[in-house]
Structure formats: structure tokens, C-alpha cells
Amino acid sequence: MTKSTYVELGEEKTSNQKGNMKRGVSILDFILRLIAIVATLASAIAMGTTDESLPFFTQFVRFRANYDDLPTLRFFVVASAIVSGYLILSLPLSILHIIRSSAGMTRVIFIILDTVMLGLLTAGSSAAASIVYLAHKGNRKANWFAFCQQYNSFCERISGSLIGSFIAIPLFIMLILLSALVLSRR
């Protein structure tokens, strides 16, 4: 009689440990989504509010640098905003996974949508990084001159806004791997 009691307790602990593991992964998923929201939203806001004006000869003639002048920086802002919106909309499902760890179909949806958002964020960040590099270094062969010496504040802000998006990229990779881990343990 005692042997069967031990076996039953052992089975309960194993299934309970599996449930605790899924719950822990779901909590980590939620935290990573919150961090990614902050990173992508801060990147979009920092880039979207970047502009600088420089006087030329007099106060009345000014040269202006704005993120909107370059289509790739516009794409970066739109991509980061879309990813932020997706992450905000995915929070209720992430909370559902904490409460009910057996929701497997939404994990598959998360893997697919997280992968799409990872691609979008990577494309926007890479495109913006190439323009930021050209702004800092220029390209002599194409007669593109580096303008960061003149527009120092503008260049610092657009460079800084890339940091958040490049933080969010590994977070998305971790989110995809966590969802795959939970599905494989199912």
C-alpha cells in the first residue's frame, strides 16, 4: 500500500513540476514582452521626434534635419510602431498563458506572429542602421558627405534610437524559443 502511495505522489510531483515549468516560462514570456514594448516604443518615439535646425548665415535662413527626410528612417519608425502595437495586443494572451498553461494553439500563433515581427523589426533596424552609418561616415565614392559634424544632436538621437530596437531583436528570438520550448514539452 505504501509503494502505490509513493508512485502516485511521484506522478503528481512530475505533472506538477511540468505545470510549474510552463507557468514560469509564461511569466518570463510576459516579462520579455514588457521589456520589448518599452524598447521598441522608446525607439519609435526617439526617432519620430528627432529634428535639428542650424542657422545659415542669418537667423532667417535655416537648414533642417528631420527623420522624415529619409524614407528608411520613416520605415524604421513605422516598423517599430507596428511591432510595439503587436506586443501590446499580445499581452492579454500572454496573461492567459500564465493563468491557463494548456493553451497550445495560441503558442503556435505566437511563434508565427513573433517571427513575422522579428523580420519586420530586423528589416527596419538594419535599414536605419545603414543610414545612420552613412550619416556618420559618408561615402566618398557616391559623393555622400558625413553630416553628423554639423547635425550632432540629430545624429546622436538617431543613433540612440537604434539601441532599443537592437535590444528587442534578441528578446523576440528568446520569445520564439520559449514558445517552442513549451510546445515541445507538451
From Swiss-Prot:
Belongs to the Casparian strip membrane proteins (CASP) family. Residues 1-26, 96-107, 183-186 are cytoplasmic. InterPro entries: CASP/CASPL, CASP_dom, CASPL. This is Casparian strip membrane protein 3. It is a multi-pass membrane protein. Keywords: Cell membrane, Cell wall biogenesis/degradation, Membrane, Transmembrane, Transmembrane helix. Regulates membrane-cell wall junctions and localized cell wall deposition. Required for establishment of the Casparian strip membrane domain (CSD) and the subsequent formation of Casparian strips, a cell wall modification of the root endodermis that determines an apoplastic barrier between the intraorganismal apoplasm and the extraorganismal apoplasm and prevents lateral diffusion. Homodimer and heterodimers.
